[in-house]
Amino acid sequence: MALICELDEQWSFVGSKARQHWLWYAYNTKTGGVLAYTFGPRTDETCRELLALLTPFNIGMLTSDDWGSYGREVPKDKHLTGKIFTQRIERNNLTLRTRIKRLARKTICFSRSVEIHEKVIGTFIEKHMFY
């Protein structure tokens, strides 16, 4: 059975808001869990990294917002764009932002190192959101 998967990226920072750090992840719409995630800048290369992590899964359709990297990197025959197709992952972004204060936009809780930032967020996702 082929999966329908939502893709999105979420902004955060390390040290100061000028040092942007992005969480890219794929959300399984059937189980409500995270299939794969990666960290990196908001570039096509990071998008390719995420798509490479999804190759073991039988994914029939990928949905995302209209961010340019998805349009360039996701195969056209498997890609749908639009707000209606990303409601679940956007809601999950809010859950992550609420439960992990390092992802909040206006906060005094932030990481000082990229290594700790990625470990804290990665551990949370692996413990609470992999299905």
Swiss-Prot record:
Keyword terms, alphabetized: DNA recombination, Transposable element, Transposition
Biological processes per GO annotation: DNA transposition
GO molecular function: DNA binding; transposase activity
A Pfam family the protein falls into: DDE_Tnp_IS1
InterPro entries: Transposase_27, Transposase_27_IS1
Family: Belongs to the transposase 27 family.
Its job: Absolutely required for transposition of IS1.
Name of protein: Insertion element iso-IS1n protein InsB
Lineage: Bacteria, Pseudomonadati, Pseudomonadota, Gammaproteobacteria, Enterobacterales
UniProt gene name: insB
